[in-house]
Amino acid sequence: MAIATNAGFVELAKHATGTGSPVAWTYMALGTDTGPGNNDNATSTTLKAENTTSNGLQRTATGVTASVVTTTVTNDTAQWVKTFTSTATMTITEAGIFNASSGGDMLVYGELSPTAPMVSTDTLTLTIKCQFKAAS
């Protein structure tokens, strides 16, 4: 399940009003945390254990395809898709969408279930969606 973050809501308000300096979310990051609960709340600002090593699984905007798709109402969902190719051995357990190559604001956070054990030359295609809808 993906969790929208408070920092993401702030940036969405900037986008909606044209105030401040809103930046588009074009970066996808992967992490390896295995602790219970990880970052499963709206106050999260980072992945719990983001991979920052240059091994094909680090945060990037290269190759990330961002689009809008339909879930309930036409074009109500932002979607990011990226295929990562590993040059290392690790298990990916979490992912997030950011608006900067490091730091920045995290819009959504999600835990992978099942997790993705990776070895060199493995690929992982990840799709992250964020639907905009009224609270229920």
How would you describe each model-predicted region?
Residues 1-93, 99-136:
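Small cysteine-rich, disulfide-bonded extracellular modules of the LU/uPAR three-finger superfamily
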